[in-house]
Each structure stands twice: as C-alpha cells, then as structure tokens.
From Swiss-Prot:
Regulation: Calcium plays an important structural role, providing stability to this protein in the cytoplasm. Outside the cell, the decrease of the calcium concentration triggers the autoproteolysis.
UniProt protein name: Pre-pro-metalloprotease PrtV
Domain PKD residue range list: 758-835, 855-918
Post-translational modification note: PrtV is expressed as an inactive, multidomain, 102 kDa pre-pro-metalloprotease. To form a catalytically active protease, PrtV is first secreted, and then it undergoes N- and C-terminal cleavages during envelope translocation to yield a 81 kDa pro-metalloprotease. Outside the cell, the 81 kDa pro-metalloprotease undergoes an auto-cleavage. The two major products of autoproteolysis (37 kDa and 18 kDa) together form the so called 55 kDa active complex.
InterPro entries hit by this protein: Ig-like_fold, InhA-like_VEG, Pept_M6_InhA, Peptidase_M6-like_domain, PKD/Chitinase_dom, PKD_dom, PKD_dom_sf
Function statement: Metalloprotease that exhibits a cytotoxic effect leading to cell death. In host tissues, it could play a role in pathogenesis by modulating the stability of the extracellular matrix components such as fibronectin and fibrinogen. Also able to cleave plasminogen.
Length: 918
C-alpha cells in the first residue's frame, strides 16, 4: 500500500485531468440565474420573444440538458486529491458516536483559522473592465466602474461592500465568519486588472463536442503569468497551507510552493447568468484545476525542493465581473471540499434542497440575486466542522434507540447562532440496500468497498497433474481505473487472466490486475498450467487508495479445469474454504448509513436571504421554523428525476399539499414546493406569484404543521421530485414552542412504539415443464419486508425475493414462502404445484411398398416419452387416410408426396413429407 500512497497518489493531481476528455471546463448549475439565461436565449433568437412562460422554461431546460449531456459536471470539478480529502472527512463523520470534535485538516481548536485568498482580475482586448458595455438588461449588479477595490471589499471587507444602489451587502468574509461562529475567516488581495492576449470569446466560446468553455483554463494561466511579474504581490503570503500534504508529514498548515486559494474574475457576466454582451461565449462560473501544476516562472518560494524553488498554482475558482457574495462563497465552498447539493443532471423539477442551502440555489438569494446568500445545509456545516474545526455547529447527537428509553426535549437555536445548540443529529439503524445479485445460488464472494483497503481471501489449492489447468470463475467488478486494483495471486504473486490489464500509468507495480468495469457478470479464466501437480496458495486481493470508493469485486462459482475435467473449488454456498481478511460472503445487498439533521431556520443574519427570493420579478420567502434534513448515504447524488423521493440529501417537506399553476395545471417546481418545508407553530406567509402571461401560483394551504412522524408519507405524491421517502422507526418530533422572532424552538424527540402489523406473504407461480418462475406479491403495510425464505418442497430453499428454480423429477410439490418484516413478525403462504418433464416431440417415419399403382404405406413413428395416439395421411389427390397403415391406388406413375402427421398422448404433433416413387 505504500506504493499506492507515495507513487500513485503523488502523481494523481498532475495527471488526473491530462487526457483530452478534460480539455474543457465543467459547469456549475448551482449558480444558474434562470431568468437571465432565458433573456439571453430570447435576445439571441433561440426563444421567440412572444413565447409563453412554459415554452421559455422548456427551452431553458433543453439548453441546460445539452450542456449536461455533452459536458461534465458534479464531482468532475474536483481533482483526485480533493476527493481523497473529502473521503477522509466523511469517514470521520460516519464514525462519530456523539458530539465528537475530530478535525482532519484543522489548526488547534483554540485558534481562529484565517485562510489566504488571492483574487486575480483579468479582462480582454475587446472587453476592457472599464468599457464592458454592460447595461441593466444584462445585470442588476451594474456599476459605473469595477475597480479592484470593489473586489477587495466584496471578498475581504469586515464591513460589507457597497451595492449598485448604495446598499450595504454582506462580503464573503462576513458570510464565512458568521457561518463559522467567527472561528474561520478569509483575507487576501485583489490584483489586476490584467489583460488577456486574445478576445473574450476565445476563452468562453463553447466546444462543439462538449458545449462547455474551451479555453477558460488558458485564461487562468495567462493571469498567473502576469501575476508572476507583478511586484505588488508577495506570493509567500498566499502559501501557508499544504492542502494535499505533498511531503506526507501530516502537517497541512505549512508552505508547499502552491498558491492556496486562487479566485479569478473575468470582465464579463457569466454564461450562467446570460453572459452579458458575450452571451453563450462568456465563461461559466466554476471550480476546477489546471490539469497540471502551472509554474510561475521567475518567482521564488519557500520550498526550494519543489518546482525548482518557484511558486505554482493548481486549483482555482472563476467568477464574473458582476459577481455577488453568493456566487463567490458558493465556489469557495467547493474549494473547501463541499460538493454541490442540487440535482447536477437536471433530471427532474428540482431536488428538495433548493434555497435552503448556498450549495444549491441559496447562492442566488437576495433582492438582487446573490447579495444575500442563505446558510449552509446542516450536512455542509457538519462537513466543515470536521474538516476545518471551529464553531460551525454546536450539536447534540441522539440515537433512535435511546429515545425509546427516554424522550428528549431540546432547545434548538437558529443555525446562525453558533454559541448555542444549533443542530441535532438523530442516527438510525443501518439501511439495507439491494446490491449485486450472485451469479448463481444465494451468495458470492465480495471484496467490500472503501478507501485505503487491503482486503484479501485465500486458501490452499491442489492442482492435479495435466497438460492444461485453468481457474474459471464468474466475476463482476467496478474498480476505479488506474487507481484501484483487484488481483488473483498464486503463492503471493499476481497472475494474468482474460480480465486483467497491464496498464499501470502511475507505476504502482501492482499489475497484472483487474481494474475498470465489467458491465455485468463475466466469465474469467486464468492459466494455472505452470503449477500442475502442485499444491499452491490461491488468493484474491483488493487494493484501493482514497477519494473514490467504487463497488469493488464480486467472485462466484470458482472451478478448476484440468484437461477438460472441471471440479468445484467454492461457490460461496455453505461453509467457505477461503480464509477472509476483508473479503466477505455477500447475499446481494449491502448496508448504508442514514440519519436526520435538525436545523432551525429564520430570517436573521445570513438567512435574511430566505425572506428575499426573487422569482418572475416578485419576492417570495422560505418559511422559518424547524427544518428536518434526511441524509441517505445509499445514494451518491440528488438526481431525483431518476429516483423520485430518494437521494443523498434533502429536506422533509412539512406541507405535503402540492402547488399547481392556475393556467396550465402544471405542478410547480420543487423550489416552490419546499418553501414551507419547515415545521412550525405559526401559519405560513401567503404566496402569490403571477407570470408575464397571467399564470398564477398561489399557496392556499397556510396552516402550520408542528409535528414530524416517520410513519407518515413525505414522498409528495403530486410533486415526487420534492418528496423524501423515509423509513418508519417510530421517530416523532414535536415542536413545543418557538420564539416570536423565530430565533429558536423547543423540540421534543421520542420513539413511539406501536403494535406491529404483520406482513402478508403472497406469490404467484408460472410452471414450464420442470422449471418454475415466481412473482412475489408480498407486502407490509407499516414497514418493510427484510427477509424471504422459500421452501420448494424438494429440500431446496432460497432467500431471494423472487427466485426461479427447477425440479429434477416430475410430481406434486408444496411451495412455501415465509416473509419477515423489519419488526421481526412473519407470515407464511403455501401453494401446491404439479410439474412434469417437458414433452418430447414424437418422431414421424414411414415405409411403403407398391404393386403397379397400388401402394401400401405404414407408420414406423415413435414417441420416446409416451405413445402415438393419432396418425393422419394426406394423399397426392388431397384425400385423408387415418390409421397406422393404408392401401390406395395412386393416380399415375412417377413421383408423389404423401404427408404424414402424428400426435402423441400429450398433444404434441410432428408432420413430415414422404417421397413415393412409382
């Protein structure tokens, strides 16, 4: 594993994005300004000016879908090392049993951490920063001039920055200080304006292949080259972190020769907000890296052994000239390791996060979009607490089981109040998730999944003498290509087979090995002829690094074939012959963490933006109160259009009444549905929005809901993309009181024990010969069925939900199914079936003799599993004869065709034609 750690991972950053696939840059859909994008599409003729609001939205969705389909997004914006860091933090979170204070990359907990950010401003020959041709049509963040001092205040001021109409808006520094309880801050400098060598469209123009920006990274490199010659910047001030621990000493707070946090501002509106005068040729705001370290020639760092003692840059974020704090703080959140929380593929009408988090739509909150970004989700604050340390959350952790013994009453303060309890985590029993079904039988061998694994299974194997010996098995694998490897070993050395590769781009020394994806179960074979006549150690191992934990390796039905004769080694059924060190037997499912995070939201501090959300030129609000987040780690995305009601993160909507547009009858998007997701004692504020073509959205159900119970349906059947499917464990959360200003609420958490309703076992069977196919129609009205046990009446059993099986003998059999629910209650259903061997077709044949034109024919037909019960002859003149033999006079000499049809005692028919020559 040291080889992986020091060689493979050290090269990961420099090479991860070097292939042609990543010549373009990603898009961040979390910073989309839909209204401005629609205006751009109208302005450029892609949408008719008189199009209806519905048609405009459809056109916008198509525009975004094209970018998603052709380009790349989501975690593609993170390099290998950044993903590894995130994985380490998540591992710490999963292991916490209480208000644990582990910090992975933090300073001493008593210190306030201030990170250094360097902002570079760069314009274009055809679009200077002081002559950018912007108008109110392009942006609400319109200034006469965009001086460097504006960005200095926007990012680093402790007093805010001046808005276009003289307002005082929150700076990025103030946002992070508020969210962290003043335990984390940023400082830095805005340098420039520099000037690019080419016109703006060269950098932001979209690739024909991906429809994403072609040369945005080239613009970043040009800005860095000019930075290297700028005498006003002391680069050593911006190298105080070793973000990826390049020297492996565990110290993340030391120089590494790389600029810590780099922000680029270009002289146009971003494409995500219409692109200003450039339209689609503007750069789309994003977080990314430069593919390989870019060295700032002529500079001198404090790390002489790296980059020839010069500074370099790698990670960056890029924002538009008119950026507000929301976009900057969102992209900087990525730089701290946070993923996007929205539906990164736009699969449906929106995920149930929306404006509730800056890492979704909350970056665009405010009367002027982006000037009042909303707070982080509880999940994001939990992540930052464990990665940075400080006071992002002041939380209590409870388990569902301890609530059964004693209910708890908690005063939960608004999420912006970090000095008092502002989050409650409720852990649940592990969630059982359907996985990879075995290739055959009930079990297969599984490597398990995870970071930094060194898993193995082994056993002695005696290989008989022979000329050709082959190990054969079924394999299913999904392994991070070029980074993680599974291997077959003989006496500790890896051997090659038909599913292995010799590709080893990072010189790990682990090949031949299995890497990449099999796309289903495949037949594997490995030549063991060199060890014929010997007893060897057969082993499988699975070696992974950090960052991206893919499914791993499954192995089933291992056989040894010597000179054509096969013997079973192990099929994972019964007691295994393998010794396990990390590998396990797997029955086609795995377990995942899931839990609730309780957060109190208000319209105070950074959450003022929840009261000022602009849609269709009108303001709406997200309601204050108790927000219940449900985290489900069995999912890695929020693609709710593909799995409605399910995803890795979302809020439980307290108001299950769907909002519908009056004119079209269309169910509104999730951003409108979850406006009232909070549980509260106070009725909701009214909502009424009217579009330009008179379509009205009005919320007619404003009654408060103060109680959550996990036995209720929160899947939002009318608007399923906004719903959350939760599991019933008896969790009940009651809001007892809340302050008039919504600064806190008093919450009672309990586990309610109710009499379990037993499951109902039911099934249907389809019999074909000796084979039987089952359809399981069992149900559990108040929970989930967690196990199935079939008895086929012949000594065979199965734990699959809907198995298919075969009998070896005909006869009557009683098939029994026993189902057990998540509370331990069971039910049994039995059905008797009759099976028979498949009927063999009768074999038709005949002989004949003739005397002149007199012909006698007789059937010699047989039936191997019965008897012939009907014989029919069709003569040349069309007449029909029946019986095993007949005599008839044929009309002429020559060649004649006689058709013989025979039927057996089970109705099978065979017909042949007999040639008669007279």
């Amino acid at each position: 594993m040291k080889t992986i750690k020091k060689t493979l991972l050290a090269a990961a950053i420099a090479s991860f994005f070097s292939s042609g696939l990543y010549a373009q840059t990603p898009i961040d859909l979390g910073v989309v300004n839909e209204d401005k994008l629609i205006e751009m599409l109208v302005r450029t003729g892609q949408i008719p000016a008189d199009a209806s609001d519905v048609d405009k939205r459809i056109a916008l969705e198509r525009y975004l879908e094209e970018k998603i389909r052709s380009g790349f997004k989501g975690d593609a914006q993170f390099g290998k090392k950044a993903l590894e860091q995130r994985a380490k933090i998540l591992k710490v979170i999963d292991k916490q049993k209480g208000p644990h204070k582990a910090r992975v990359f933090a300073l001493d907990v008593g210190q306030k951490r201030t990170d250094k950010v360097l902002a570079l401003l760069i314009d274009f020959p055809d679009l200077p920063w002081d002559d950018n041709r912007l108008t109110k049509e392009h942006t609400e963040m319109l200034y006469d001039r965009y001086e460097p001092s504006h960005y200095q205040d926007l990012l680093f001021s402790d007093k805010g920055y001046t808005g276009p109409n003289g307002e005082n808006f929150i700076s990025m520094r103030q946002y992070y200080e508020s969210e962290s309880g003043n335990s984390y801050s940023v400082s830095g400098q805005a340098a420039g304006w520099y000037r690019a060598s080419k016109n703006a469209a060269y950098y932001g123009g979209n690739s024909p292949g991906t429809n994403n920006d072609m040369n945005a990274r080239e613009l970043v490199r040009e800005a860095l080259d000019q930075l290297a010659r700028d005498p006003n910047i002391n680069l050593a001030d911006y190298d105080i972190e070793d973000r990826y621990d390049y020297n492996g000493n565990g110290n993340f707070r030391e120089p590494d020769g790389v600029i810590d946090h780099l922000m680029i501002f270009h002289a146009s509106v971003g494409e995500e907000a219409g692109g200003g005068v450039l339209g689609a040729d503007a750069i789309w705001s994003h977080r990314f890296n430069l593919g390989r370290y870019h060295v700032l020639e002529g500079t001198k760092s404090n790390v002489p052994g790296r980059f020839n003692g010069q500074f370099a840059a790698f990670d960056y974020t890029i924002q538009p000239i008119d950026a507000a704090a929301g976009v900057c703080a969102h992209e900087y959140g990525h730089d701290l390791g946070l993923p996007d929380e929205y539906d990164t593929q736009y699969t449906g009408t929106g995920e149930p996060v929306s404006y509730w988090s800056i890492m979704s739509s909350g970056s665009w909150a405010g009367k002027i979009g982006g000037t009042q970004p909303t707070a982080f989700s509880s999940w994001a604050k939990q992540f930052l607490q464990n990665s940075i340390g400080g006071r992002w959350i002041n939380h209590e952790q409870l388990s569902i089981n301890e609530l059964e013994a004693k209910p708890r009453v908690v005063t939960l303060f608004q999420t912006t109040d970090n000095s008092r309890p502002n989050m409650v985590k409720v852990t649940l029993p592990m969630k059982r998730v359907e996985g990879i079904k075995p290739a055959e039988g009930e079990f297969s061998f599984y490597s398990n999944r995870g970071d930094d694994l060194k898993n193995r299974m082994s056993r002695p194997l005696t290989i008989p003498a022979g000329s050709q010996a082959t190990l054969r098995f079924k394999a299913w694998f999904q392994i991070e290509k070029d980074y993680d490897y599974a291997r077959v070993l003989i006496n500790g050395k890896p051997i090659a087979g038909n599913i292995t590769t010799m590709d080893d781009p990072f010189k790990s020394g682990l090949v031949p090995a299995i890497s990449g994806q099999s796309d289903g179960w495949v037949d594997a074979q490995f030549d063991l002829s060199a060890w014929a006549g010997q007893t060897v150690e057969l082993a499988f191992d699975y070696l992974t690094d950090g960052g991206l934990a893919m499914e791993g390796l499954y192995v089933d039905d291992l056989r040894l074939e010597v000179d054509g004769n096969q013997t079973l080694i192990d099929n994972a059924e019964g007691t295994s012959s393998f010794a396990f060190q990390g590998f396990t037997k797997n029955g086609g499912f795995h377990e995942a963490n899931h839990y609730y995070l309780l957060q109190w939201r208000s319209h105070n501090d950074v959450d003022q933006g929840l009261a000022n959300l602009k849609r269709f030129g009108q303001l709406m609000s997200f309601e204050p109160g108790l927000l219940v987040w449900y985290v489900d780690e069995s999912y890695a995305d929020n693609w709710v259009g593909k799995h409605p009601g399910e995803g890795w993160l979302g809020v439980v909507d307290a108001d299950q009444n769907a909002l519908v547009w009056s004119k079209t009858g269309e169910v509104a998007q999730t951003r409108f549905q979850v406006r009232d997701a909070t549980f509260s004692l106070f009725d909701q504020a009214p909502l009424k929005l009217v579009t330009a073509d008179g379509n009205t959205l009005e919320d007619m159900n404003l009654t408060a809901n103060a109680s959550f119970s996990d036995d209720q349906d929160y899947s939002s059947p009318q608007a399923p993309d906004s719903g959350r499917k939760v599991m019933p464990f008896g969790l009940k959360i009651d809001l007892l009181s809340q302050s008039k200003e919504n600064e806190y609420g008093v919450v009672r958490l309990s586990k309610v024990t109710t009499e379990n309703i037993a499951p109902v076992a039911r099934f249907e069977l389809k019999v074909e010969g000796l084979s039987v196919m089952s359809q399981n129609t069992s149900s559990d009205s108040d929970g989930n069925i967690v196990s199935y046990l079939w008895d086929f009446g012949n000594g065979q059993t199965s734990t699959e939900a809907a198995p298919t099986w075969s009998y070896t003998k005909a006869g009557s059999y009683s098939v029994t199914l026993t189902v057990t629910d998540d509370k331990g209650d069971s039910d049994t259903h039995q059905q008797t079936i009759k099976v028979d061997t498949p009927n063999a077709l009768p074999q038709a044949s005949a002989n004949y003799i003739h005397l002149g034109r007199w012909v006698t024919m007789w059937s010699t037909s047989t039936d191997s599993d019965g008897r012939i019960v009907d014989t029919e002859w069709t003569l040349p003149n069309g007449k029909i004869k029946r019986g095993r033999m007949f005599t008839a006079i044929f009309p002429s000499y020559g060649h004649h065709d006689v058709q013989l049809k025979v039927m057996d005692d089970r109705g099978a028919v065979t017909t042949i034609t007999i040639k008669v020559k007279l």
